[in-house]
Every structure is written in structure tokens, then in C-alpha cells.
Amino acid sequence: GCRFTWYFHYMPVGNDAAADLLPTPEQRIKMYDSVRRFRATKSLFTMDFQNDAEYVGGCIAGGRRYLHINANGDVDPCVFIHFSNANIKECTLLEALKSPIFMEYHKGQPFNKNMLRPCQMLENPELLRKMVERAGAKSTDLQSPETAEHLCAKCDHYAEVWKKQADELWSESQAKKAAKKSTTC
């Protein structure tokens, strides 16, 4: 039987990706609550890629715990972030990890103190724009190269509407943890 589930949110990657498929704040809160309910009532481990960043200290990409190498050999910081300065056919993995885009990740992580807003693309698109520009990273999308501006523009509204809900939910979550900790100590 199933012992592990991992939920991923829609990521609007690609020139033709539709931003209106991103979950609404209400849908995201429902996922947050559902995953926590599953953990409390089901005998399986359930993880939510976006809503569980607190368990891994934020975004895992950029070589912190994860990276992506596409079919062309381009070393991307994330499977959803198709921007790079390095190709594994031309450098070592260590050299790729020291490339400008990976160093931008290293300098910026975590991208937000609110672990319900961990992603520099989805919840903090203003950061990804700057990171790609400072790094001079190029699109590595093999089908239809997309600019950082185009990618991030699809996330701006989502980030804006999610921020208020995420900040409230994060504050509540941290208050509950603090209250629980004070009663167990």
C-alpha cells in the first residue's frame, strides 16, 4: 500500500503556462489543513512541497539540498527554474555550484522568513528577477526559452494575494507551536 504522498502545487513554467491554474489562497489553505489532518489520522507520511518548507528550512533548491540537470546538461537551480550559467558537459558539479546563479541562491536563502512563502519564483518573484539579472543567467528551457520577467510576471499577482493569507497562517502556526512548547516544558 501507499506509505508516502507528496503534493506539488502547479508552477506556471513555460511561455504558454496559464497563471490562472495557480491555486487560490483558499485552495492553498485547504491543502495546508488537509495535509496536517492526514498526518494526524492516516498511517502514511504526507508532504506538501510548498506548505512544508518549515521542515527543511525553506527552499531546497540552488544546490542547498537539490539541483536539476536537464537533458542538454544545463545545471539549473531547480526543475522549475530554467536559468543557468553552467553546463555539466563543460564544468564539474562543484564548479556549477559555484556559478553565479547558484551563488545567488546561496546568498539569498531562505528567501522569506515566512516558511509558507519559500519560493523565490512563486511567492517572491521580485527576488528571482534580481537573482537572474545579477547572475547573468540564461534561459535553459529546451522548448521555448522564457525570460525571467515573463516567468515572474505570471507569479506577481499570486504572490501578492497569497502574502496576506500566508502571513496570517504563519503567525497562527508559530503561536500554536510556542503555546504547545510552553505547556510541555
Describe each region flagged by the PLM:
Residues 80-185:
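Flexible mid-to-C-terminal extensions adjoining Fe-S/redox cofactors in radical SAM and related proteins
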Residues 60-64:
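Short, small/polar residue-rich loop motifs at catalytic or cofactor-binding pockets
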Residues 1-58, 71-72, 76, 80-88:
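Radical SAM enzyme [4Fe-4S]-AdoMet core and its adjacent flexible, acidic
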Residues 58-59, 111:
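Short secondary-structure boundary/capping segments
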